[in-house]
Amino acid sequence: MTTVAISRCDNYELEKVSTAVKKCLSLIGNIETIVRPGMKVLLKLNLLSASLGPERAVNTHPVVIRALVDIFKGDYGCEVYIGDSCGSLRTGSTDKAFRVTQIDKIAEDTGAIIVNFDKDDALDITNNNAVILKNFKIAKTVKSVDIVVNVPKLKTHGLTRYTGAIKNMFGSIPANGKKNVH
């Protein structure tokens, strides 16, 4: 089941973002029955650009990721992974995006594990009931964790008009595979 929660936050100060994120988790309800110590949690962020920092509002803001890492590691005792495949099709873009957005520093400071989906093993997914896309690949980590927390960046998009939670999951498709399913 998919549950969505939204909370207003007027800036990216860590304390305010953490409060807003905790409010979202409380809106989901009974989070303690879903998340247990030792679970593997993937924060599926949105890294569209390897050249634009947090101030450009293109990628998931690093403070949001920091707040989530602190909550899932600190409050729930989970093993936290941070993963994506950058929107750019250039080799090395995802690693660069983790650096430019300072996600690599967050992982280093907190012990979270960065997963570059372009370098992750890929799993073949088949859905014979699908009308159009019956087969595609996703990063293995997406299926191997206990919980995937989708952390999109709501913004406009040239092909789909806007991008959000559903579109963000396209980043689970490694490397050039994304262009085939757009």
Regions found by a protein language model. Give the residues of each.
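N-terminal and secondary-structure boundary signal
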Residues: M1-H182
